Amino acid sequence: MTAFLDFEKQVAALDRQIAELREMGDDPTLDIEGDIARLEDKSAKLLRDIYARLTPWQKTQVARHPDRPHFKHYVAGLFDDWMPLAGDRNFADDQAILGGLARFRGRRVMVIGHEKGDDIPSRMKHNFGMAKPEGYRKAIRLMQLADRFGLPVITLVDTSGAFPGIQAEERGQAEAIARSTEQCLALGVPMVAAVVGEGGSGGAIALAAANRVLMFEHAVYSVISPEGCASILWRTSDKAAEAAAAMKMSAQDLLALKIIDRIVPEPVGGAHRAPEAAIAALGDALEQELNGLSGLPRDTLLAAREEKFLAMGRA
């Protein structure tokens, strides 16, 4: 059953009524199909209306929804011949960032992304998608491997940010993030990044300095979380909604600001309500972007990527 967000209470109430009527439908003396159909139409219309006018803070809640597809779901739904690659060849294998070789609609690619996990044990295993230095160094290693063999790189970004623990800082978290960003910019092969949920701070940009940056319709991408921004500006996280609006972190705002290149539409009610449709939509968008980049000379890819990021913030 779908976990409803706080702004979906009316939809939740209608769905409960539908469920109750369905239970009564087992009684052969009752004819309630018409009532169920009317309630389903009302629920669908209400859901469309709500999602057509989501605030940035509400989009943040959708992007964080626990049932939203994660990296492993995209790998299972879009890629064949998946061969995971592990370790940074220096310290450890960070499970917050996964990556490996795969075949995507006929072409060999390198796929790298954040994995948050689905339940408590897996979220602990993947550290809620918050990577440590060894995770970013693993990503660097895989990008270098892709560059060596001429494989396009696809990255799927979904993290609240890099892990801020003392051990991560002692092992060079800032340096690892910077090196990963640098490696993205130095790739001589096509690179397409997609923000599929949260895109938080340097932990996100380290995998997103790509030729083309895509975002799901209800994903968010920012330098800090709304709660963190509110705590700095207003000394309270209670103003997270105001912070989210001020930071322009939605896909629509970022497309207008030319931070991203394309918005991938989500099913009505968010990717968590129809994961297969969302995964297919992302696959189509990735294929189109790779088709546009394939065959371009190395120098052209490098120059275009560099200019893209240097142009950000210019008048």
Swiss-Prot record:
It catalyses: N(6)-carboxybiotinyl-L-lysyl-[protein] + acetyl-CoA = N(6)-biotinyl-L-lysyl-[protein] + malonyl-CoA. Its EC number is 2.1.3.15. Residues 39-292 form the CoA carboxyltransferase C-terminal domain. This is Acetyl-coenzyme A carboxylase carboxyl transferase subunit alpha. Component of the acetyl coenzyme A carboxylase (ACC) complex. First, biotin carboxylase catalyzes the carboxylation of biotin on its carrier protein (BCCP) and then the CO(2) group is transferred by the carboxyltransferase to acetyl-CoA to form malonyl-CoA. Acetyl-CoA carboxylase is a heterohexamer composed of biotin carboxyl carrier protein (AccB), biotin carboxylase (AccC) and two subunits each of ACCase subunit alpha (AccA) and ACCase subunit beta (AccD). PROSITE patterns: COA_CT_CTER (PS50989). Its main location: cytoplasm. It comes from Sphingopyxis alaskensis (strain DSM 13593 / LMG 18877 / RB2256) (Sphingomonas alaskensis).
